[in-house]
Every structure is written in C-alpha cells, then in structure tokens.
Amino acid sequence: MKFVRGFPSTMMDDYQLNLINILRYAATNFPEREIVSRKHDENIFRYSYGEAFKRVCKLANALEKLGVEVGDRVGVLSWNTHRFYELFFGISGIGAVVVEMNLRLHPNEIAYIANHAQVKTLFVDETLLPLAEAVASKTKIKKFVVISDNCFETKLPEAYSYEDLLKNEDSRYDFPMIDETSAFAACYTSGTTGMPKGVYYSHRAMVLHTLVVALGLSLKAEDVYMQLVPMFHANGWGVFFAATLAGSKLVFPGRYAVDNLKPIVELMQSEGVTVTAGAPAVFIPLLTYLQKIEPKPQFNIRAWSGATEPPIAMMKGLKEFGIEIIHAYGATETSPVVCYNYVKPELARKLSENEIWELKRKQGIPVFGVEVKLVNDKGEELPKDGKTIGELCIRGPWVTKSYYNDPRTFESFIGEGWMKWWKSGDAATIDENGYIKIVDRFKDLIKSGGEWISSVDLENHLMAYPKVFEACVIGIPHPKWQERPIAFVVPKPEFRDKISKEELLEHMAKRFLKWQLPDEILIVKEIPKTSVGKFSKRTLREQYKNYYQKE
C-alpha cells in the first residue's frame, strides 16, 4: 500500500477534533439531560450536561491557577464518579494530559507510572488518601487535590479540596483549539510483563473512536448508560464519551464490589439503565446475584462485554433477565475497541440457534477504521480460513504506534511508519466472514507432546458446568510432555462441599480427548486476579511451576 497526496479539498481540514467539543455539544443540545452519580455514602448526586459543562469551565480556570500548563501530565486516582468525568474534560480541555491511575496496582507501580509520566499534580479520591500518601514520597508530585464532599485530614503536602477550588471560579472558559494529534490522556498497561507501559491517546483518536462506539451500541438520547468499567482502564472503554455525544443519561455508580452487587442492581432499576459495559468478572457475579433474589427483575439492557470467550451459560442466563451481551474486543493499546460482534443478516437466516450462540462468542468483525491480520512467528500473513491460528496484529487511527519512552516498543510492533502494526500477543483465527476468534494468549497456550491445548476452551467448558462459578486453566512444566494443563475451580457458594474432581472430568470428557483433559483439577476458594479483573495466570504458574517435581 502506498501513500499519495491528491488534489486539495476546500474543507476546513484545519478544524481540530478536540475532546471538549463532545461535552460542549451535549451541553448545547441536551442541556437538561441528567447525569447521576452515586456517592460514597450511597446518596445520589444529580445534575445536567449544562451544569456539568459549567463545572468543567470552573475546573479549567482552577487548573490554570494551580499552575497546570499545556502538555502537563495530571494524575487521577478515583472511582467512577461525576468528578472523574469532569476531570477528563477539564484537564484535556486546557491542553494537559489525564494520566489514568489504576488504583488496584501496587503502590510501587503507581509511583513508577507517576514518575514515568512526570506527573506534577494528582487528583485523589478521599477514600484513596492512604494509597496516595504511600506513593507521594516516591514521586515528584508537587500538588494534590482531594476529591471529597467533606473535610479531610491528610499527610500530603500542599493538598487542596476539589470543591473549594471550583467554588469561586468563573463558569465560563475560552477553551483553546488544541492540535488534535496532542495527547489528551494516558493509560498504562497492567504490566503482565515487567513494569506498566504507557499509551498516550490523542484527541483525534478518541473523537473518532467515540463516533464508532456510538454507532456500535446504537446510542440515542433516550438511552441510560451506566459506567461499570473502571474509568482508569482504557478511558473506561470510551463508552461514556459516546453516551455524552448521543445525549444519553449517564449513571456513575461510584465505588462498588462484585461480591455486593445489590446497590448496582438497585441503581439499574431506579435509573432505568439501558446500556452498560463490563468484563465477565462483573457479569458472572451479577448473574449469580440475579438468580438468587426475589422478585426476579427484568431489564432491557444491551451490554458490551470483553473476554477471550464469554461463557454461553453467562450469556444465556443474563438474556433471561433482559440483558443482551454483545461481545467486543480491544486493548489498552487500541483505545480500546477493535471489533464487536453482531450476527450478519445472511448468517442469521441460515444458522441454527446453537450455531448463532457459538458465533456470538467470537470477538466479532473489526469496526470501521481498524485493520487486522494474522501473522506467524516470521511476520508472514496467514489465511483467514477460521482454522489457521496466528498472532493478531492491528492498526488504525486509534491504535498506538509506540509505548511512551519505552524500549519494549521495538518488540511489540512490525512494519514502519504509518504501515506499522501492533502485535497483540493474542492467538486468533479469522473466518471467511471476517469474524475474529481469540483462541488464547500465546503465552497461555499449552504445548503438550507437540500439540496445542487452548486453556480458554477448557475454562469455558468448566464454567458451563452448573456447579462452577469460576475456572482457570494453566500449563505447567512436565518432564515428559513439556507442559500439562491443571485447572483451578471455584464452586458456586451452594455447591462448595458438593463438587468433585471426578464429576468435572466426566463433564469435560464429553467434549475433549483424553490427552487434552487437565491432569489435575483443584477446588479452591478464589483465583488470583490482575488489577483489571483477569485471572492472574502468571501468579498461578509461579506457584505451581514445580508441581511435577514432587512426583
């Protein structure tokens, strides 16, 4: 593919795509549409897009007085609240960069991110002050702003109150036209290999991404969107930007835990939620909770979910409560949306119901603007036949072309310049209809006796068993077979003492060959997880690496 420059257009191509214009649009055209935020005391705060824009103007004025300048990196440690929402627009609106800090990381990793990004100012939720205090001395952060409704005490130097800063500021601000290729936010990968890697998102990338997300979820002003995905995780998947553009009502649930989803379900019911997004780590416990309570609630919700392969039991179970799971795929490096799954009309007409459910488990087809291909270990492109497994490589206008100030960039990309592709590390197939299926992470595929075993396939079949809540499969070194799979199973609470390894193996033997079955199935209370809720297979592999040396 070559690059050519054609005849010049007469369009205003110098008009820059800036993120602040999304909120300005909503405030102008949907000024009364509501934004709802659940506070730590479980009281509900309500205001409108029109009021939110005025507060963002106040925030912009306050940031200038704090000494925040164009290009400065400003850290945010917060839950999903209306103030985090304001910070995204206020910080980026003046030309600075929102550094999304994963509050579930170790303090040393948070300090690393702050130093690597050269964060000078940190906004921190009052409930996270102990974490900020533990990090502060390891960084060069000069100013701290506490996000709180109350008076607070802290050991942090030069600490300000968020609301006090905004209180007397002008509710008007002349936002600059920012070069659209400038960064508006940064997110650091969760560090599955070494320390976190920085991805810096441009205004242009996020505005284009927002348009595609709004289209993919068919967002409208009548919709009510709940932000379940942590807003520090790849811009909260960017859906709240798309919902803002559509003029949808926004619901921010604040701090919540998957082992107590009652407040979330109550909020979904009281606010009339119609759209949400989240990982199976949220939706599986949600299904378990809904199955327990009486009376059974009924929703009308379309929900994006991202996973290697969502369990059919989860998708079918939530469907009974009116929650339609739409499978999607992405990564921090892709802003994050790469593809989402919808059944093409011509396939819907000829596939059986079971075949449609199987199709829905695939990642889907790439969204407009994103290109994908499969390559082998030599970088050669592989066929899209639904069978050949290769590494999924991705490029597009909201895909990163490097990691910020990080030598690991070299090993993560192929190609040069605008022809560059990001190597996802995912083992995948692409079928003749364009549907991507993630088979596994390459590092999680199990090589046994020269043959590959997908840990994901084993996990999903285990999780389809009625007594199983969660299941994780890893490969561990074996003296004869190179690697062998072992499984970790968390039973549903009511079956904790009523489940056996033998019945699980019998269940799995109906689908898998004997050599593919786990050598061991361990019944455990919990499975370790990463900061973004995925199974921490690295932790398990380290713990069980000498398992066969005991024999």
What is each PLM-predicted segment?
Residues 23, 65-66, 93-167, 493-495:
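Structural core segment of the AMP-binding/adenylate-forming
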Residues 31-34, 158, 167-188, 195, ...:
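Conserved pre-ATP/AMP-binding loop-to-beta segment of ANL
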Residues 207-224, 234-274, 284, 289-290:
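Conserved AMP-binding/adenylation subdomain of ANL enzymes
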Residues 45-50, 184-208:
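Conserved AMP-binding A3 loop
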Residues 105-111, 120-124, 269, 276, ...:
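AMP-binding/adenylate-forming catalytic core of the ANL superfamily
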Residues 349, 365-369, 377-413, 451-453:
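Conserved ATP/PPi-binding loop(s) of AMP-dependent carboxylate-activating enzymes
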Residues 245, 273-278, 287-358, 371, ...:
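Gly/Ser/Thr-rich phosphate-binding loop
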Residues 35-81, 85-89, 106-111, 161-163:
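Conserved AMP-binding/adenylate-forming core of the ANL superfamily
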